[in-house]
Each structure stands twice: as C-alpha cells, then as structure tokens.
Amino acid sequence: MNFFKRLARKVNSAKVIVFRPESEVLDETGYVPPRPAKHYIPDWYKKIPSHVDRNSDVNPRTQEKDHTVKGCVPILDAFTSGYIQELNMDIDVQRSGEGAVAFHWPRQNPWEPVRAPRHPAAMKGFVHPDGYDSNPYLWMQPFEFNVPKGYSILITHPFNRYDLPFLTMSAIIDVDVFPQRAEITFYLKSNFSGVIEKGTPLFQVIPFKREKWESETAEYNNAWRLRWVNLSRNVFGGAYKKNFWHKKEFNEKPQPARCPVTGATEQHGDQDNVR
C-alpha cells in the first residue's frame, strides 16, 4: 500500500442511510429511492476525451500527454458522492404569453411531483440566482431520510450539473433526530419550456458526520511548499490518484424480497440498530 494512503488508513465499517417512503402508494408513483450518485454520471462527461490531443507530443514537465478535465479525480468524486433522487415521470413545462409557468404530468399518478411554496411570499428578500425565475418551486419527493446518530445530510443541486434546466437549493438537515420528508426548493431557468424527462437527477444527498472544527492560519514554509509541489505536480496525470486519493463508497443494499401473496417486504429496524 502507498505510504500516503497507509499513513491515513482507518478501519471503516459501512454506515446506513435509510430512505423510508411516506406513502403507501409508492409503487403507483413510479418513484425509486435515491440511488448511489455513481449511476448518474452524465453522458456528456463520459464522452469527453481523456487527452487534450491524442496525437500531441509528451509534456516535458509531466512526461505524459496532457490530460483533459476528465482526468481530474476530485471532479469525478463530486459526481459520484452520496445519492441522487431522480424524477419519477416526464414533466412538461409550459409558459403562457405573459410568462406564467404551468407544470403538466400524467394525472393518473397519485403523487404531485412539483408545486409552489405554500406561501407566495416565503422567499421574499432571498436573492435568487441570475438567469432563473424569481419564484421558486418545490420538488415533492416521497421519502424520509434517516442516518445514524451524530450524522446529518447535505441536500444540494447535483454537483457539476450546470446543464439542467433548474437549480436546486442547498440545505443541511439533522435527519438523525428529525427523520422527516423534505420538500426541496428549486428555481427554474428563465424562459425554459419543454420536458424535464423521467430519470433526470433532481438533487444530491450526502451524509456527513457532525464534528467541531476550528480554523488556523499557518506561517509560510518554503520547504513544505516545495515538498508538496513536487509530489503533486502531475495531478491530472495520475499523481493525486496514485499517492493521495482515497476511495469513497456509497452503495445500496439489495431490495428485500416481496411476498407474492401479501406484497409485504422485510422492513428496516429502528434507527438505533443502524450502524
């Protein structure tokens, strides 16, 4: 094992995040619980070539061909961290001549996927992002989130997904003690009309441990700087992944078997029993 990885090695046991449906009619809504974000890497990212120019000469500094952003492991880590809630149906977004927005979806679906905030003035004074409608909406997802004691979750717009026609707001919730269903606020791109397709990632859920942090500013140390500059000078070429990077694992347990007679499934135990 590499020295740097061995230096920071710890014994890890899997923590469990539970997605519990609030509605008994979940199967009729088309919703699936949030899944590992690694399943939602966008196709446009996958199509990016690994090198700036496959026919170019070797970079004399790195002794390798120049890599594109696809070789940046921290960006890939952002794409694949946590869990993603996807849209359960096609939503047709239409605008009137005055610019009023209307959302349309199959009315036989018993779950309302989108609605406006309960009070129109709820976001008054909040600076909305440029290029988006000033009035926000809510993703009405049907799951409660629950994590082990001492943990919280970050809910945010899918990392690096600037191509989506909406922007989901970020929030942190202590769902270890407040395992409630969250209504997720989002802004729609100005003048967007069209279909937001089923399977579109709506928001990313990342569990993290609550800990006390303090900041400090260290004095400049040239020897320290040169040491790390020399070690990390070829980050895109693989030095970071080879010497420093640690694998992050966000997986899902197999779904419990369903009784063919009653339709009942094995249930999760109390959160106190979750590691």
Residue ranges and their predicted role:
Residues 1-181, 185-275:
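Non-catalytic terminal segments and appended small domains
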